[in-house]
Amino acid sequence: MFAEFGVLNYLTYLVGAVFIILVPGPNTFFVLKTGIAHGVKKGYLAAAGVFIGDAVLMFLAFAGVATLIKTTPVLFNVVRYLGAIYLLWLGGKMLYAVLTQRDGQSDASAEPASAILKRSLTLSLTNPKAILFYVSFFVQFIDVNAKTPGVAFFILALTLEVISFCYMSFLILSGSFVTRYVKTRKKLAKLGNSLIGLVFVGFAARLATLQS
């Protein structure tokens, strides 16, 4: 399938892409957390930031910028530490909100839509693991001798975005269901926010020790 456009082993790529999307990451937890805290509409807004960020990284990978980052330790470390600091800030902010929240106080602040979009976009763009993925994974399924390697790259990128959209939709709708359940269970909501905050801190620690 799509071999005429320079795509190699598309079905193998499709299966691999599904499993990769299903692996939890910072973007996954941010979208889930947003869906739980702010509802479906803002959950999709968070997902939109992820989609835009992924599209930018895929374009940079195709343009060769991602390879430059991968092979230049200084650039890789800059992206890596920026991402780790941002994840640590997000996790710390969530934990602080839980610790300072008073009983009976609502934990769902009216966070502006623009802030949610910026956060999810920043999470995507400061993830060097995604950069390494697009360089190392995509290249295995593109015939470099094809007349239209750009079309092949676009097909692979679009496939990944569609799979990601389906998975993010599941997370957002699940988060909306969870919201209705925990509205009257404040201790459970606090526990959930604490766990997600700790997950972000854990991702920050792992990202800080990532090697190119």
Curated annotation (Swiss-Prot):
GO terms for cellular component: plasma membrane. It catalyses: L-leucine(in) + H(+)(out) = L-leucine(out) + H(+)(in). The keyword Nucleus does not apply. It is a multi-pass membrane protein. One of its GO terms (molecular function) is antiporter activity. Belongs to the Rht family. This is Leucine efflux protein. It comes from Klebsiella pneumoniae subsp. pneumoniae (strain ATCC 700721 / MGH 78578).
